[in-house]
Amino acid sequence: PTTIEARVQIARPCIKVGALVYQGNLPIMMQVKNAERIARTCIRHPRGENIPMKALYNDGSVAELPQDEVTHVIRHSAAHIMAQAIKRLYPEADFAYGPATDNGFYYDVDLPEGVKISEDDFPAIEAEMKKIVKENLKFTVFEKPRAEAIALMEERGEKYKVEHIGDLDDDARITFYQQGDYIDMCVGPHICYTKL
């Protein structure tokens, strides 16, 4: 497979609404513009629950959040957004792994013979990623038993995922995350929506 890698720079992460600063055990960076958006300042956990942020009333100063946790969740979610963008542009793409890294994120992508992704294609992939972000798709999580998980990935043409699930115990339950039309086998966590 071809590895597509992106680097993400995160600067001074915080969640702030006026004089309210939000933080939690597994935080995510979001610039919250109004109180209605507060419900979206969360991370979607594999058990399907939102991990809420804790409000700290102070003088409006920015609270520091654990950089490594913020960065990991954003990068991990960005990898899923990139995979969805690639799948839209290259429907035959087959994905292996796509984790967050210390410098960004990547996804191993297998394409049919004669189809290649080069640096010249990156602007189109980035543009599609921006569309997905604008669509503000919700990350949802669901579980399936091993046999159903294999069937789902076979139906979607994901041979590497089928192979990986096939290596798991017969009684395994597999976690999937979905945003819009894209579904990936994943243990999470992720941001709640593609648009921060």
Regions from the language model: what does each represent?
Residues 1-12, 24, 28-40:
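Ser/Thr-rich, low-complexity intrinsically disordered segments
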Residues 28-31, 40-45, 49-50, 57:
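Short, positively charged and aromatic/hydrophobic N-terminal segments
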Residues 54-61, 101, 111-196:
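Non-catalytic interaction/regulatory segments
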Residues 59-99, 185-192:
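N-terminal catalytic cores of NTP/NDP-binding nucleotidyl/phosphoryl-transfer enzymes
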Residues 104:
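Short acidic-rich active-site patches of cyclic nucleotide enzymes
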